[in-house]
Amino acid sequence: MFLWLAHFSNWLTGLNIFQYTTFRAVMAALTALAFSLMFGPWTIRRLTALKCGQAVRTDGPQTHLVKNGTPTMGGSLILTAITVSTLLWGNWANPYIWILLGVLLATGALGFYDDWRKVVYKDPNGVSAKFKMVWQSSVAIIAGLALFYLAANSANNILIVPFFKQIALPLGVVGFLVLSYLTIVGTSNAVNLTDGLDGLATFPVVLVAAGLAIFAYASGHSQFAQYLQLPYVAGANEVVIFCTAMCGACLGFLWFNAYPAQVFMGDVGALALGAALGTVAVIVRQEFVLVIMGGLFVVEAVSVMLQVGWYKKTKKRIFLMAPIHHHYEQKGWKETQVVVRFWIITIVLVLIGLSTLKIR
């Protein structure tokens, strides 16, 4: 919205600053951060008054039983902060902004309903897996179709393999939709599985969003894209605004979500943030880079799939408990040790992902 002020720069020179993506990106992050910090205490009080306490599963780590009753659904604060900040600092004429907000809020609505069932009916399992998959699939397919037909040229419909500049595979509409589906739905569920310890998913989301923001900035400028041999995606620079708003909102939320957590983000936050990250990766054609930078999310999801699949086949478990962060808890790691060490791993993975900008 504030971008429109740049049109009046002929009357007031200082307003020209609003046209710069970097300025608006920083302001979007600060606005979302301030929003989360300002409304965080109020959100926690309201969730507590509404008795939106987390129902902790009895088959999980016994140390988590003390978390029973901690307010959940705090992700609604994150989504509100992202939406407000993006609308204030983003370009409303850019379709990517609306697609990202649509995916964020649509998957957030699913997460909200899931959390609500857990809170009202005291059912830790929430909505059925079938209902969740149908909803997520619908959102991913609609977003994928929109992004495919927004592509300005065939270069925006290719599969890019990191580190290999010669490998760029044309996808076509079916391939594009399949890849979009796997990226958006997969990341949504992976982040949700990661969100099992205080702050574990929140900070990695910040790191990955920041990394993708750099790719979006480069892809949205033709000269940078050509120099770095990235596909030029017209309008992708506005995606930076969304990414930095996500960073700010999550950092503000982390203030209250750090151990010992005063509030959990719940599915309303985790499902939405994961889907949003996946959508950003699809827009800038960096699905494989997301796998690298979001390696923590991938490992968490794979650990669950391996555990379930192996148990069904052999009645034995690969890990002491899944997702894998619980495995390390069972091995004697303190919760804060698991969280900080996984943060460090994510920092390294994001740096590796960023290295693909030049190592080709």
From Swiss-Prot:
Alphabetical list of InterPro entries matching this protein: Glycosyl_transferase_4 (IPR000715), PNAcMuramoyl-5peptid_Trfase (IPR003524), PNAcMuramoyl-5peptid_Trfase_CS (IPR018480)
TM region(s), chain numbering: 24-44, 69-89, 92-112, 133-153, 158-178, 199-219, 239-259, 263-283, 288-308, 337-357
Subcellular location: Cell inner membrane
GO molecular function terms listed in the Swiss-Prot or TrEMBL record: metal ion binding; phospho-N-acetylmuramoyl-pentapeptide-transferase activity; UDP-N-acetylmuramoyl-L-alanyl-D-glutamyl-meso-2,6-diaminopimelyl-D-alanyl-D-alanine:undecaprenyl-phosphate transferase activity
Domain of life of the native organism: Bacteria
EC id: 2.7.8.13
Protein name: Phospho-N-acetylmuramoyl-pentapeptide-transferase
Native organism: Neisseria meningitidis serogroup A / serotype 4A (strain DSM 15465 / Z2491)
